[in-house]
Amino acid sequence: MRKPITLILVVALALVLLATSEVSAYRACGFPGRRCSPTEECCEGLVCQPRKNGPSMCYRPDP
């Protein structure tokens, strides 16, 4: 009787892990407000802005 419940839980866990890995792959570039470094690029259309009193951040430049 317990096998179907266990199977459902395992499948649900696998789907959650797959979904989170997809999101992290999508977020591989720096989105607005994310810290950036010379090795980590910001997303398309964003630039890495060094700040005096903190880490560099990605931001959308004014047109």
From Swiss-Prot:
One Pfam short name: Toxin_12
GO cellular component: extracellular region
SS bond partners: C29-C43, C36-C48, C42-C58
Alphabetically ordered keywords of this record: Disulfide bond, Knottin, Secreted, Signal
Signal peptide, first to last residue: 1-25
One example GO MF annotation: ion channel inhibitor activity
Entry superkingdom: Eukaryota
InterPro entries given in the database record: Huwentoxin-1
The keyword Secreted is annotated on this UniProt entry: yes
Main location: secreted
Domain note: The presence of a 'disulfide through disulfide knot' structurally defines this protein as a knottin.
Entry protein name: Cysteine-rich venom protein 3
Highest classification ranks of the organism: Eukaryota, Metazoa, Ecdysozoa, Arthropoda, Hexapoda
